[in-house]
Regions:
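Active-site-facing substrate-recognition patch
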Residues: 1-51
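PRPP-dependent phosphoribosyltransferase catalytic core
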Residues: 2, 6-7, 18, 137-191
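A generic structural signal for well-ordered alpha-helical segments
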Residues: 46, 68-69, 140, 165
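Short glycine-rich phosphate-binding loop at a beta-alpha junction
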Residues: 51-58
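Conserved acidic residues
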Residues: 52, 118, 148
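Short Gly/Thr/Asp-enriched flexible loops that form oxyanion-binding sites at enzyme active sites
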Residues: 63-72
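Short, glycine/charge-rich flexible loops or terminal/linker lids adjacent to PRPP-binding catalytic cores
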Residues: 74-120, 186-189
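Active-site/ligand-binding-proximal alpha/beta "capping" segment
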Residues: 124-142
Length: 191
């Protein structure tokens, strides 16, 4: 998606440890018009008429997933990273390693809101190694739901997470795949 790549070129930064900082428009301060364009782009790739829920992980994927869900006319569900007192029923859970936070976290989804009748589109703002998305896939499988696809706004292609999903046969679309990121800027792979 050329518009997204241009925003990354113009406003993105690379921090030590290959951290790609796009928080000025994607995952801290959010450009909602850009997210609408991203949702429209995903709708060109995925059959949104089949989807019954959009799933993401807490926290920075929530804004994009919400706009996608609103456009597709379905609920948005996010996996929590901590159990709260307001979850009464059983939980689906998956333990994953967070690249950003450098620690293991447990993704939690209430069994009340995800079941075998659901057709799920996983949406996330960012993918590095793909562990968080794999945790969401595991939760979908545990629920017996049908995974319709995975949509990622920005993928760090040099970390291999997206390549694993492409090889898996799961419908997968990343809109901006960063092949290289350094002090000289960004190089994108054909998405």
């Amino acid at each position: 998606m050329e518009l997204l790549q241009e925003r990354i070129r113009r406003e993105g930064r690379v921090l030590p440890g290959n951290i790609v900082k796009v928080d000025g428009f994607l995952n801290h301060r959010v450009d909602t018009r850009l997210l609408e364009d991203i949702a429209d782009e995903f709708a060109k790739y995925f059959d949104t008429s089949k989807i019954t829920v959009v799933l993401t992980a807490e926290a920075s994927g929530i804004a994009l997933a919400t706009i996608c869900a609103q456009k597709y006319g379905v609920p948005m569900l996010f996996a929590k990273k901590a159990k709260s007192d307001n979850i009464e029923s059983g939980l689906y859970q998956s333990e994953v390693f967070s690249y950003t936070y450098k620690k293991r976290v447990t993704l939690l989804v209430s069994q009340e809101w995800l079941n075998a009748d659901d057709h799920v589109l996983i949406i996330d703002d960012f993918m590095a190694n793909g562990f968080a998305v794999q945790g969401l896939v595991d939760i979908v499988n545990e629920a017996g739901a049908k995974l319709e696809g995975i949509g990622i706004a920005v993928e760090k292609g040099f970390q291999g997470g997206g390549d694993r999903f492409r090889a898996s046969g799961i419908p997968y679309k990343a809109l901006a795949v960063i092949e290289k990121a350094d002090e000289n800027g960004f190089v994108f792979r054909e998405a």
